[in-house]
Swiss-Prot record:
It comes from the Archaea. Pathway: Cofactor biosynthesis; coenzyme F420 biosynthesis. The gene is cofD. Its EC number is 2.7.8.28. Catalyzes the transfer of the 2-phospholactate moiety from (2S)-lactyl-2-diphospho-5'-guanosine to 7,8-didemethyl-8-hydroxy-5-deazariboflavin (FO) with the formation of oxidized coenzyme F420-0 and GMP. 7,8-didemethyl-8-hydroxy-5-deazariboflavin binds at residues 54, 93. It comes from Methanothermobacter thermautotrophicus (strain ATCC 29096 / DSM 1053 / JCM 10044 / NBRC 100330 / Delta H) (Methanobacterium thermoautotrophicum). It catalyses: (2S)-lactyl-2-diphospho-5'-guanosine + 7,8-didemethyl-8-hydroxy-5-deazariboflavin = oxidized coenzyme F420-0 + GMP + H(+). GO terms for biological process: F420-0 metabolic process. Homodimer. Its cofactor is Mg(2+). InterPro entries: CofD, CofD-like_dom_sf, FbiA/CofD. GO terms for molecular function: LPPG:FO 2-phospho-L-lactate transferase activity; magnesium ion binding. Belongs to the CofD family. This is 2-phospho-L-lactate transferase.
Length: 306
């Protein structure tokens, strides 16, 4: 039986996992629920791949490859390399241990919904926090580019985010069981520094989520430092949706429900403009280069409820 959450975190597969490493060192991991983006989920070489969910699980289990922020540390790639030799192209480079985990998830999905499969795998990995996929339903994401429509990983991996982005579209799905309750029962909800459009956006656009967020104390960490995203094409995606590619644009996306935005010292010049949208702006170092940075940011976020 999961303990009632003190903190609920909305997460994608980049940025936020680093913050989670700090949070679990500041509060009891059992008091943390992580709601994870699933819009990138799909099948690859016959196995079900849930990139962001697995990254969060591996991070909380202490086995994440911190050089890439996906997959298992020290993994081998014999299966991936053999498949390529056999003429079976794989867009994603999946390690052998990582693949075994995905095979198990695929088998479990033949018997149960995704949130139950994730719960079983979470316990098997010894993860103390509760990890919830945002939805049990499949969601399609399309990156509309100046070269035509592309699947997310086609754009991100095969094309290395190079084409110009005109729009980002994803289907709206229903929250998985427990998602809305995890938000409404939390002392604080944190939107981690993941991509606001393709990672956090699909979560907050699900039915009922924004209404739930309006009822609670919500803080967010901007994924921008000095006008540049921590990683990935967040800037391109935000501009394609009509937002400024900056911490100010993040504030615009979250303005309907956000109580506080934490921004980096390099973005301090935006504080005045952001305060027109968000009632509280905190300026600190948000670039998490080591465990000390991660703990410090976690303490700043949780200061008022610790």
């Amino acid at each position: 039986m999961w303990r009632q959450s003190m903190i609920t975190v909305l997460s994608g597969g980049t940025g936020t996992p680093k913050l989670l490493q700090g949070l679990v060192r500041v509060v009891d991991p059992e008091e943390i629920t992580v709601i994870v983006n699933t819009v990138e989920n799909g099948y690859l070489s016959g196995v079900y791949v849930a990139p962001d969910v697995d990254t969060v699980l591996y991070t909380l289990a202490g086995i994440i490859n911190e050089e890439t922020w996906y997959g298992v540390e020290g993994d081998t790639f014999i299966t991936h390399e053999t498949l390529r030799e056999l003429g079976c192209p794989e867009l994603l480079r999946i390690g052998d241990r990582d693949r075994a985990f995905k095979i198990q998830k695929t088998l479990l999905l033949g018997e149960m919904p995704l949130h139950r499969a994730v719960e079983i795998q979470s316990r098997a990995l010894g993860v103390e926090s509760r990890v919830l996929p945002m939805s049990n339903e499949d969601s399609d994401i399309v990156i509309v580019t100046d070269e035509g429509d592309m699947e997310f990983h086609e754009f991100l991996v095969e094309r290395r985010s190079e084409p110009g982005v005109l729009d980002v579209r994803f289907s709206r799905v229903k929250p998985a069981p427990g998602v809305l309750d995890a938000i409404e029962s939390a002392d604080m909800v944190i939107l981690g520094p993941s991509n606001p459009v393709t990672s956090i956006g699909p979560i907050i656009n699900m039915e009922g989520v924004t209404d739930s967020l309006r009822k609670v104390n919500v803080s967010a960490v901007s994924p921008f430092t000095g006008g540049r995203p921590f990683s990935g094409p967040a800037g391109k995606f935000m501009e394609a949706k009509g937002y400024d590619a900056s911490s100010l644009g993040v504030a615009e996306i979250y303005a309907d429900f956000l109580d506080r935005l934490v921004i980096d010292e390099t973005d301090s010049d935006l504080k005045g403009e952001i305060e027109k949208l968000i009632k509280e702006v905190t300026i600190t170092k948000t670039n998490m280069e080591n465990i000390g940075d991660k703990i410090m940011l976690a303490r700043i976020l949780l200061g008022e409820i610790l």
